[in-house]
Amino acid sequence: MNKKVIIIGSAWPLRAGGLATFNERLAKQFIQEGFDTSIYTFSLQYPNFLFPGSTQLSNEPAPAHLKIKACINSINPLNWVKVGNELRKLKPDYIVVRFWMPFFGPCLGTILKLVNRNKFTQIICIADNVIPHEKRMGDTLLTKYFFSSIHRFVTMSEKVNQDLKTFTQKPSINIVHPIYDNFGDIISKEEARKHLALPVNEKIILFLSLIHI
């Protein structure tokens, strides 16, 4: 029987972004490696007052060949208990959970505490951030609550790994973020510039960040 992996984090039908794209690609890789894989994502990820956009939902079709269950409500404790008990009884071999901001500490931490009662499932956290970019009162408590249920950690930058060690000495590994291979074939710089109507030989600065006003 194939080992069972459940990924907890953003995925379709939520709007595509870095986390959702990563989780869906990770699920496909687990499937290719022979694991029985599914994703548990959010039925409600952010309350509206925390979400600046017009919609949190994708208008794209569901990813092919992926089992995705949108069932986690980030602000409903009764839902956390329901999902946690469901996963506890399901007894997956591994849960891979994403952590990127303390807001999700109570929700995901409670779910995982219930899962841990089966004394079987290994819980691995991919920590995108440990210390949030915009700090708020209570962040440390929420982060510690979540981390208390994790068995092992994966980080994708040395700085995040260092931040992690200020919270816990549980096993961790730092792995460079993989290059995505699901956005089409790589093209040359010359082709890309022609497509974007940019000068082929000029020096161009590409700015990838946010500007706070």
Give the positions of each predicted feature.
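Short N-terminal targeting/anchoring amphipathic segment
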Residues: 68-73, 82-106, 121-124
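A short helix/loop element that forms part of the nucleotide-sugar donor recognition site in Leloir-type
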Residues: 184-198
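Donor nucleotide-sugar binding/catalytic pocket of nucleotide-sugar-dependent glycosyltransferases
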Residues: 148-186
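A short, glycine/small-residue-rich beta-strand->loop->alpha-helix junction that serves as a flexible
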Residues: 10-24, 100-105
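Charged active-site motifs of nucleotide-sugar-dependent glycosyltransferases
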Residues: 4, 94, 198-205
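N-terminal strand-loop element at the rim of the active site
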Residues: 10-15, 28-89, 160-161, 165
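Conserved small/polar residues in nucleotide/adenosyl-binding loops
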Residues: 211-213
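Nucleotide-sugar donor phosphate/pyrophosphate-binding loop at the beta->alpha transition
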Residues: 119-124, 130-149, 158, 187-188
